[in-house]
Amino acid sequence: MAAPEAPVKYVGICKDSAAFKLMKSMGWEEGEGLGKDKQGIKGYVRVTNKQDTSGVGLDKPNPWAFDTTQFDNILKKLKVQAAPTKTSKNDDDSDKEDESEDDAVKSEPAKLKTVAKVTRPQGRYKRREKGKLVNSYSSKDLEGILVKRTEDPSPAVCDIADSMDIEIISEDQDASIKEQKIEEPSSNWWGFKSGFVSGGLLGAKSGKKKLKASERKMFSENDQENLYNMVQDKATAGKQGLGIKDRPKKIAGVRYEGKKTSFDNSDDDDDDDDDDDEEDEEEDEDESEADDDDKDSVIESSLPAKRKHDEIIEPKIKLKNLCKQIVKKDAGKGGFMKLKQLKSLIDEQAPSVLSEFSSRKDAIAYLKLKLERSGKFVVEGKKISLVSSKK
């Protein structure tokens, strides 16, 4: 036994529901109204599409592809005559006899009746594709469709070509041919209305045209490039206020003015400066003042520009001033001292000065070379002494 069809949702009344059975048990029958006097609604609540909230001028979509009822009605109205089918041989013989009798009776030839064939979508599409084929078109029709350009130039182009005298120079021609001036196109040229400038025909020798003072100069690509470069070069010229350039630079909210000084840490750079300045200083200095200055100038401390986190700042020691102080204090008779003795005293007082040398011989050679370059010391073989200030 086939199962009953399931009720469609939201359409009609579900008679198998508990509510319908409860109403039946209470004395209500289908088709009667609700209420005490049965004056209420008799049918079920029908669900409708609520459209009362749509605004004025709402365009409802027209799903024409899903509604084909009109097309079906048109097809039904069409008269379709089906071709006769052959049932048996006897029917065919009888038909032939009838036709022969009719032909004998009728003297005039009967007009053949055209039978309308059933329309099919394949036939419609075939006709469309057949209409797109170009094989059956004539040459004139093809020229009208494909718009082939004719070899004869248009009258507008002819006017421009006739009015312009352009010289096309090739390598085979003689070099003695004079250049002809390129005349401007006619005033009826369409390019003037759009702001174009004629550049000549292909192969013509380019040359600058002299514009008259009364004529208007056109804006070219070079002018655009020059204008861009001029604006970019002077882009920062107007960002500062009046008088700002003449005032000193502002650092941390204060106008800073001063001299820039640099500190040199190498001994070699100091040698050249000492040789020039020491000769002038020795003429004006006394011996008493020289002793005090030497003691103060042995150790000089200078703060570096930037210091690392774990870096220890050590005092800077000048080798020449230290040697001068040692020779004055510990020199023997005649004011002479040996280089070995001077080197050992330097290691005692400032061991870091000559610590770069691995051997003692290299350190003594460097010390001798350093003192020979200075004008304060006199080096005679392995002995050293100070230059006397008395002349």
Curated annotation (Swiss-Prot):
The keyword Nucleus applies. Residues 92-102, 265-295 have a biased composition (Acidic residues). Residues 80-132, 212-307 are annotated as: Disordered. A motif (Nuclear localization signal) lies at residues 305-312. SMART domains: G_patch (SM00443). GO terms for cellular component: nucleolus. This is G-patch domain-containing protein 1. It comes from Arabidopsis thaliana. The gene is GDP1.
